[in-house]
Amino acid sequence: MEQGSGRLEDFPVNVFSVTPYTPSTADIQVSDDDKAGATLLFSGIFLGLVGITFTVMGWIKYQGVSHFEWTQLLGPVLLSVGVTFILIAVCKFKMLSCQLCKESEERVLDSEQTPGGPSFVFTGINQPITFHGATVVQYIPPPYGSPEPVGINTSYLQSVVSPCSLITSGGAAAAMSSPSQYYTIYPQDNSAFVVDEGCPSFADGGNHRPNPDADQLEETQLEEEACACFSPPPYEEIYSLPR
């Protein structure tokens, strides 16, 4: 726990608020539709001027010259194409719309792009995180006290202990790794868990050391007795069937 709190202190998380920024119309990037509309508008104006020039050259100043007869046809064609481009730019892309329409559209765009609240930026981590218009609640963890030993279930330990109040290290490890569902549901007061009173007690008396072969035999007998004592009761004994 102390190591975890030390790591948290090494990487503090700073939270600060940022006032929302409302982008102006000059900051908004020009879209592709605006570019296409502007291109069509200027192209139409240029073609219209060229068409008017050719029309004037063909029909007014050079009436008696045969070399300028092609201008009488080319001028109106260019003029019609230029007018068509101008109409497309004005009607479809709204390049020459009225001032009131532009102001209303800008208000709608500003209302859609404006965030509902302030922005919060989290720093002190791998990548800063920004929340727009979100409610942020800072969590302060409680101070960690001295490390306490992990609590052990006493009922589970009682169920693990053998009837003779002695168990081997291998048996204890196997019993501790097994789940405690059955023994927590059915305590030792059950008749199936009642131990015999004639079970021998092994207490250390003096500095006497028994024979190693005798110790192995006693451990084997204790393991067999523990397995016999821990055998689950029959189903009929636990749940009596209604008649």
Swiss-Prot record:
Record GO biological process: phosphate ion homeostasis
Please list every transmembrane segment annotated in the UniProt record, as residue ranges: 40-60, 73-93
* Species of provenance: Pongo abelii
One cellular component term (GO) for this entry is: endoplasmic reticulum membrane
Residue runs in coiled coils: none
| Descriptive protein name | Transmembrane protein 174
Query: Where is this protein found?
Result: Endoplasmic reticulum membrane; Apical cell membrane
List keywords of the entry alphabetically: Cell membrane, Endoplasmic reticulum, Membrane, Transmembrane, Transmembrane helix
Q: Which Pfam families match?
A: TMEM174
